[in-house]
Design a protein with these regions (language model features):
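A short, charged helix-loop
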Residues: 42-68
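Generic alpha-helical structural signal
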Residues: 8, 61, 65, 118-121
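A short, N-terminal "cap"/entry segment at the start of jelly-roll beta-barrel domains
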Residues: 21-25, 39, 47-55, 223-224
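N-terminal regulatory/effector-sensing and dimerization cores
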Residues: 1-43
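Terminal helix-turn-helix DNA-binding modules in bacterial transcription factors
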Residues: 119-126, 130-138, 143-144, 150-199, ...
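Residues forming well-ordered secondary-structure scaffolds
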Residues: 22-24, 58-62, 84
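Glycine-rich, flexible loop/turn motifs
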Residues: 37-47, 104-108, 188, 201, ...
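Short, Lys/Arg-enriched, Trp-marked, Pro/Gly-tolerant hinge/linker segments that flank
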Residues: 49-57, 71-86, 90-130, 134-141, ...
């Protein structure tokens, strides 16, 4: 995207051997996310997304100009503005990436786009504590049990119930991080009948017990090796 047409960014000249002369402006930034044991969006995104300038994307260039201005001048409320604008540009980038995915794509983003699997994901995300079965999920979206099981596994790489179990741990980790609820209360909120069952599932996914996870997150220490979901 030709941001050089719009931005007066701080300049650093880099000499690159070339037979052609050209100017380019690089605007660098960082957008972080909370540490979670299971983040399907981040795991699915490629290391590099190349999004070209398109008609109707003028607002992105305007946002980039404002981002640079806020970064330079450190005005009141600037940090909050940078956070919101960065989030909006990230959402737009992910949306455009999903829209450009080939029909044969596989993975969480492809599942999100699918009219059946996407609705199943939304159901589980909205109510992770519900006693979902593949039969009930299929009934909600208009697919048979076998058809949903096959379609979900083909796109996501897991069965619906495997995904639900991992998503419950994701939600539980957020509750442990952001609330003072006991482990037993968190277990109940995400659909586990007992603290022991939740603790076992949590440790299997993260390598840490819920209590240890909470202590290490609170202290800023490493929480160990997170196991990639397969």
């Amino acid at each position: 995207m030709p941001f050089a047409l719009y931005l007066d960014a701080a300049e650093t000249r880099v000499e690159i051997p070339s037979d052609e002369l050209c100017d380019a402006t690089l605007v660098c930034g960082f957008l972080g996310c909370d540490l979670r044991p299971f983040n399907p969006l981040i795991e699915t995104l490629p290391r590099l997304m190349h999004l070209r300038a398109e008609e109707g994307q003028d607002w992105v260039a305007q946002y980039m100009r404002q981002v640079v201005a806020e970064s330079k001048h450190k005005r009141l409320g600037g940090e909050a503005m940078l956070e919101r604008m960065s989030e909006m540009m990230f959402i737009d980038a992910v949306r455009r990436y999903i829209e450009a995915l080939p029909e044969t794509s596989r993975g969480w983003l492809a599942g999100l786009r699918d009219r059946f699997v996407g609705r199943v994901l939304a159901l589980m995300h909205d109510a992770p504590a519900d006693a979902w079965t593949v039969d009930e999920l299929g009934r909600r979206v208009g697919l048979s049990r076998s058809a949903l099981h096959e379609r979900f596994a083909e796109l996501i790489g897991q069965t619906p119930i495997q995904y639900l179990a991992n998503w419950r741990i994701q939600v539980g980790a957020a509750l442990l991080r952001n609330t003072s609820s006991t482990v037993a209360m968190v277990a109940q909120e995400v659909g586990y009948e007992s603290e022991a069952t939740f603790t076992k599932a949590f440790k299997r996914l993260t390598g840490n017990s819920p209590a240890l996870w909470r202590r290490r997150i609170g202290s800023g220490a490493s929480v160990g090796n997170h196991r990639k979901i397969k």
